[in-house]
A protein has these predicted regions:
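Hydrophobic "lid"/C-terminal helical patch
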Residues: 57, 99-106
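C-terminal helical "lid" subdomain and adjoining coupling/linker elements of P-loop NTPases
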Residues: 111-118
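Generic structural signal for well-ordered alpha-helical scaffold segments
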Residues: 24-27, 103, 107
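Conserved catalytic-core segment of NTP-binding enzymes
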Residues: 1-74
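C-terminal boundary of histidine-terminating zinc-finger modules
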Residues: 80-101
Length: 118
């Protein structure tokens, strides 16, 4: 299964279409069971363009988009420079909370909810 992170930006939308095409080709030629399991919206900002792109992604992949979208947040960008993940660097930041909620959503989606302590 494939999990696709995608920025809510126009060029990322084009890249998502190319990736979907590549996955279809791999399925046809090599692995008929390969499929997209989830699409995660990342680097999301409260702009009209981001909202429009997110809406288009949701329309194209209605059962695959997992909430919440991960908001654009400086703490996420800082974490790798400190050599730690966001949940260590700034767990209470918007990005830290978004990734925690996303992990819980994915665990529920994959039937691992009994292993998640909310």
């Amino acid at each position: 299964a494939v999990l696709i992170p995608v920025q809510t930006e126009y060029f990322a939308l084009e890249g998502l279409a190319l990736l979907a095409s590549t996955i279809r080709e791999i399925r046809r030629r090599l692995n008929p069971r390969l499929g997209v399991d989830a699409v995660v919206l990342t680097m999301h900002a409260p702009t009209l363009l981001n909202a429009q792109v997110a809406s288009q992604i949701r329309e194209t992949f209605p059962d695959l988009v997992v909430d919440p979208p991960v908001r654009r947040n400086i703490r996420i960008a800082e974490a790798p420079s400190h050599g730690v993940p966001i949940h260590v660097h700034a767990p209470d930041s918007a990005g830290g909370r978004d990734y925690l909620e996303l992990a819980i959503s994915l665990a529920k989606r994959w039937g691992l909810a009994h292993e998640v302590d909310e």
